[in-house]
From Swiss-Prot:
Species assigned in the record: Mus musculus
Residues cleaved off as propeptide: 19-28
Residue numbers annotated as active site: 72, 119, 222
Protein name per UniProt: Tryptase
Top-level EC class as recorded in UniProt: hydrolase
Segment forming the signal sequence: 1-18
Amino acid sequence: MLKLLLLTLPLLSSLVHAAPGPAMTREGIVGGQEAHGNKWPWQVSLRANDTYWMHFCGGSLIHPQWVLTAAHCVGPDVADPNKVRVQLRKQYLYYHDHLMTVSQIITHPDFYIVQDGADIALLKLTNPVNISDYVHPVPLPPASETFPSGTLCWVTGWGNIDNGVNLPPPFPLKEVQVPIIENHLCDLKYHKGLITGDNVHIVRDDMLCAGNEGHDSCQGDSGGPLVCKVEDTWLQAGVVSWGEGCAQPNRPGIYTRVTYYLDWIHHYVPKDF
């Protein structure tokens, strides 16, 4: 995915906001390991055609015909569904690909840049997938689920394994466990080293923080799922969105909070299938 490596903030009134650096998007798992077997059967790879159908973002199957991802993954450059393909759960990228076509791309109408939130989008597959033990939608959480601070969750993807370090062949799906960090504390962490006023919220209500030094998502993981186990059921808590660097001190990964957008999701995606 395209998780943002560095933060860009607008000027607000008379405040001068020192940004951590240029806006870049997230690409990979740092501090994790290969995800073996049929774990994470909802993970998908989004592909764009260059000299071949190349992975550019992650996503999650939330219905047999719908994929959830980040809006910054499918912005103006790839908004045409004919330019996107979806590969269902694969252990290794590009190994016996069976790419699925997309009939519709829907980005949230409030999305502009990731720092302003609403970094969420839906892709409708041309045809529904066949559900199995290896390919299965991830349940979405109830609106009441808060995912309290300290909850241990998992993020998955095929992105970079460190800042500027690409995932090497054979490009295995990676996983890493990350703790949820309460939004206020996460916001305080992001203010460290900046001259941004404390009254300016970097981490917004529709965002969720997770990760610690050495464990994080990175470039190429954008759009992928952050999942947490609640009473023996995996629920998708977040969508990989942005961050400053990968697994850096005081810079947790930032995810779009799924519960914030349940009404919008279900305006398009049936709850039952």
